[in-house]
Amino acid sequence: MSKPPFTHLHVHTQYSLLDGAARLKDMFDACNEMGMSHIAMSDHGNLHGAYDFFHSAKKAGVTPIIGIEAYVAPESRRNKRKIQWGQPHQKRDDVSGSGGYTHKTMWATNSKGLHNLFRLSSDAYAEGWLQKWPRMDKETISQWSEGIVASTGCPSGEVQTRLRLGHFDEALKAAADYQDIFGKDRYFLELMDHGIEIEHRVRDGLLEIGRKLGIPPLVTNDSHYTYAHEATAHDALLCIQTGKNLSDPDRFRFDGTGYYLKSTDEMYAIDSSDAWQEGCANTRLIAEMIDTTGMFEKRDLMPKFDIPEGFTEITWFQEEVRRGMERRFPGGVPEDRQKQAEYEMDVIIQMGFPGYFLVVADFIMWAKNQGIAVGPGRGSAAGSIVAYAMGITDLDPIPHGLIFERFLNPERVSMPDVDIDFDERRRVEVIRYVTEKYGADKVAMIGTYGKIKAKNAIKDSARVLGYPYAMGDRLTKAMPADVLGKGIDLNGITDPTHPRYSEAGEIRSMYESEPDVKKVIDTAKGVEGLVRQMGVHAAGVIMSSEPIVDHAPIWVRHTDGVTITQWDYPQCESLGLLKMDFLGLRNLTIMDDAVKMVKSNKGIDLDLLSLPLDDPTTFELLQRGDTLGVFQFDGGPMRSLLRLMKPDNFEDISAVSALYRPGPMGMDSHTNYALRKNGLQEITPIHKELEEPLQEVLAVTYGLIVYQEQVQKAAQIIAGYSLGEADILRRVMGKKKPDELAKNFVLFQAGARKNGYSDEAIQALWDVLVPFAGYAFNKAHSAAYGLVSYWTGYLKANYPAEYMAALLTSVKDDKDKSAVYLNECRRMGIKVLPPNVNESMSNFAAQGDDVILFGLSAVRNVGTNVVESIIKCRKAKGKYASFPDYLDKVEAVVCNKRTTESLIKAGAFDEMGHTRKGLTAQYEPMIDNVVAVKRKEAEGQFDLFGGMGDEQSDEPGFGLDVVFGEDEWDKTYLLAQEREMLGLYVSDHPLFGLEHVLSDKADAGISQLTGGDFGDGAVVTIGGIISGLQRKMTKQGNAWAIATVEDLAGSLECMFFPATYQLVSTQLVEDAVVFVKGRLDKREDVPRLVAMELMIPDLSNAGTNAPVVLTIPATRITPPMVSRLGEILTHHRGDSEVRIKLQGPTKTTVLRLDRHRVKPDPALFGDLKVLLGPSCLAG
């Protein structure tokens, strides 16, 4: 008689993080190969994989069984202690987290059971967390047991653990308790056999309990991978989890064998006993209980907005739009805007989304009312006039040619997706608001799956195999570079059919010729793509009208109590849960700070939304490419494009951000646009028949397809598509599937023929639209973000000190970016001063038109409380007249030696006339004295002055009447100390005066290397000062070093590997000015230079007769200007050479004025700044 087919019920997928290595596709393929109709998942303590498992199984034709191998607290889940199960000598028999939990396997038989598993898993994270285990207990299991079938679990189950410890009666009671909870026919004795002693030792006891209580046996295989040959990869995965090497004899490993998906015959053949045979057959009983009806069904879970009495959701939505239109157009709503608003409202109501708009508009309005900066729009939502009316966006879509159907398409119903930018510092306040408004159980952050990518798989595998770090590092560097952030997978190395196979020649050669490399990569293939950890979406929030745990499980991050879904956002969205993106945009923070600073510094109230979009000063800045620090326009190549394009209207700003992307740039669209705009390239129509009908669509982009909206409009005008149908066509074109394109071309051609166009014209248009549809950009997004670019450009052009101060504050924790923007301030003629206890605020602050003060909070070792106290005491008691006066006035919390030393070295007391060296020699005993007095004063023993000093003196006593030395440290030491405290050279720079020396031999500034000007592998020479040096040894005993080389605008790590180091080691000295030639390595997040040569420049005459370098945009060169410049240079005759950096649209040319020699003094510099502007001397 044939045996019933076996069903695997104890299966750990890759979602048993770093413990399960079973990939879902492999599992279901194996089931189909072995004729198994059902399979369960039972991951450790979570349901992260439930959605993926369910739908992947259904797709493969296998019935999914959703289960969990739960952690069960031995007492209450709220009790955060471990218990001692047995005597010390029985420790080996306690395999239950050292008394922290036991295991239990449970499976959902129907939709009710599935949702009860959601509840159990979620509560385990929320209330049962202990160290790293989310634990349920008998109370919660009893409460949510309906629809669930369970077993005694693996050898770590409570019943088995008590049996191993010799506690039969306790084991019997535990089994009886669970039988009562689940029911007589829904609780089983779980039998396993992997050839290990702890499984066999309790078998008789388990079966005895079964006989006494009538509990049937159930055989499982503790599967952790799909195929037997994957045991080695799984072993490596365990080592990745524990941080051990495979060769470590004491590492965690699985005892026994056979942890894969065995066939029915293999499972029955393990043991011929009746109990085992019955247990195998009983797996079919559970399979037959499974009813997946209603599982993972999509529902309408839109959060419910509170509607005022007398309105329905629809009528209140219409009323809000009406009021919003009146606010936006106080002089009367134009007819075209009103008509569009009515059309959009009809579509939104028809699609069932009025509640969505009300919810979004509400929290945006709340944020604005709280003074939280909100972006003007993002993505396709900016194409909706309803969104504009309701305050969701701040850009009128009609003048910019934006299309509503790009946002909501009545031809293709899908959830609207509005992403909102907030001031990054206050984004959490908005999330808190919606959490409180809709309920903490109805709002959660969104989980993400962190997978083991190819390069990490290589590094991890090299480590667990015992190879040195250099092995993994060498292999990852030989991998092809990422393309658009996506790396090649490891199969691409050896699979000739892989699209990137040809790029992997270097690592393939190593794989084929070096056995150790082959071993590493083969091991890496076994773990690549597995889920390593759960993370949290940077911006995504799930909102629901019902408790989220009724529809999806959650987990809790116990460092801050944040609730997070166990699934990612596409999975959550497919169930009807609303996903919103609450994004933090640093530039909103910068603009908010700058606007407030303009008010405090100049008394001007700026309203960004009211700014004219044709400010000449702003467009002059853009045309010069002076956009370092301007949103989206910060990079070197982008600045070059701006100089070439010469934008003079807002449409250009929108276009440049759309064009500056790999697709359009690969087709030279950015250059063609710039040339056509400036009359340097003829504007040719796509076809003469199409010139007039497409004139309105293409005129703004000089005949080029730049935007997705243009593709839609062209299909509407030429082929008669509705804008909704055209959006679907655009998506088809973007995917470039030949069969779909062919089918759609027939429809497109028919529509165009009907409108009277020739086949030649139709084909010409199609041939242009198809490639560009994939590259064209969403104009709604580029226009909305273009507005932010314009605002930041406006602030930099019109309020440079305030804007740059806000910009420096935003990057104060990134010293490389701080150096770039500090140098930009110098170029702009803005003086950045060291911190000053009498003037500085917490952050960078503008003073007047051309001074920025360093913020006190940017000083190392100076905490927020200290800064607040310094400012508070200064406001209450007046400025500090001297260092003793400072110690007298500030609170005791400020009188900290480490803090005070940092402030001294940073220059915060320079204004008082004390030298830093003099203060450093005296501050410690002074603090000792004043702290003792302040302590007694706080205890009420006496007043600080208390008659102890001269009654007529304004100076405090108690050892504070000190004479300070007037000597100062030498410049090198002083600047080194300043840099240590501020992370930057501020008051001066060791390289000032040496710019001409560096520019003579350096190929580029360091900021150009760390930006996008140079690609990976480029051989370049940089110049600067060695500001940090680490000497190291390889495992083979060879010396090498990492030198940090810094110039005026950035720093870069230079790797001197042994061969090079041996030649230059004596020249590698901190504070030395050097040139380094090397190969740029940009494969990691932070670029580095692999040094090939080191050169020491001759600085003996560097400070004398240094050339005067003038930076002049080519557009400024006019005969009157040249004439006046000659007069100035002649008037200030001297011995220094004059050079001009002539900034053209794509490159800068350096000219030497051999006829002129000048005296570089303030008088010359003043005349030059009047003629050429304050930034002409900044190089």
Swiss-Prot record:
Q: Name one GO biological process term.
A: DNA replication
**Superkingdom, natural source:** Bacteria
* Alphabetic keyword roster: Cytoplasm, DNA replication, DNA-directed DNA polymerase, Nucleotidyltransferase, Transferase
Gene3D superfamilies assigned:
1.10.150.870, Bacterial DNA polymerase III alpha subunit, thumb domain, Metal-dependent hydrolases
Name the reaction it catalyses: DNA(n) + a 2'-deoxyribonucleoside 5'-triphosphate = DNA(n+1) + diphosphate
Q: Where in the cell is it found?
A: Cytoplasm
Primary localization class, coarse: cytoplasm
Disordered: region residues: 77-99
Which Enzyme Commission numbers does its entry carry?
A: 2.7.7.7
Keyword Cell division appears in the UniProt entry: no
User: What GO terms fall under cellular component here?
Assistant: cytoplasm
Keyword flag ATP-binding: no
Name any one GO molecular function.
DNA-directed DNA polymerase activity
Subunit-level organization:
DNA polymerase III contains a core (composed of alpha, epsilon and theta chains) that associates with a tau subunit. This core dimerizes to form the PolIII' complex. PolIII' associates with the gamma complex (composed of gamma, delta, delta', psi and chi chains) and with the beta chain to form the complete DNA polymerase III complex.
Family that this chain belongs to: Belongs to the DNA polymerase type-C family. DnaE subfamily.
Write down the PANTHER family for this protein, in alphabetical order. DNA POLYMERASE III SUBUNIT ALPHA
Task: Tell me the protein's name.
Answer: DNA polymerase III subunit alpha
Instruction: Write down the species.
Output: Streptomyces coelicolor (strain ATCC BAA-471 / A3(2) / M145)
